[in-house]
């Protein structure tokens, strides 16, 4: 189960339908709740006063009626996304799988670092011993 939310080039958002997701159900309810939104606007005269005082908001609602129904009916259920979110269970870098991959890579890097450190230590030790042996041979 998963869905993608993204902005298009005009700044409008859209997503693919997923009937099992609660956010998608809330959004579907918002699109089908236009009578509820009309009743809400009739019962709240301050909203009408706000629309009269803010003509740009009224123009926006006239240009995007789905947004008007969405904003009044489910204002607290789902907020407009501003970036693209890809939320899907099919991705390997998701949830527990991502954590396990990160731990595996971390352990691999620690192992390689220890092997490299041991190799450098042994090489330096060998070079120092060879140098000291050559000094001892020269001093005799």
Curated annotation (Swiss-Prot):
The keyword Kinase does not apply. One of its GO terms (cellular component) is membrane. The keyword Secreted does not apply. It is a single-pass membrane protein. Keywords: Glycoprotein, Host membrane, Membrane, Transmembrane, Transmembrane helix, Virion. The chain crosses the membrane at residues 92-112. Glycans are attached at residue 86. This is Uncharacterized protein B117L. It comes from African swine fever virus (isolate Pig/Kenya/KEN-50/1950) (ASFV). The lineage of its organism: Viruses, Varidnaviria, Bamfordvirae, Nucleocytoviricota, Pokkesviricetes.
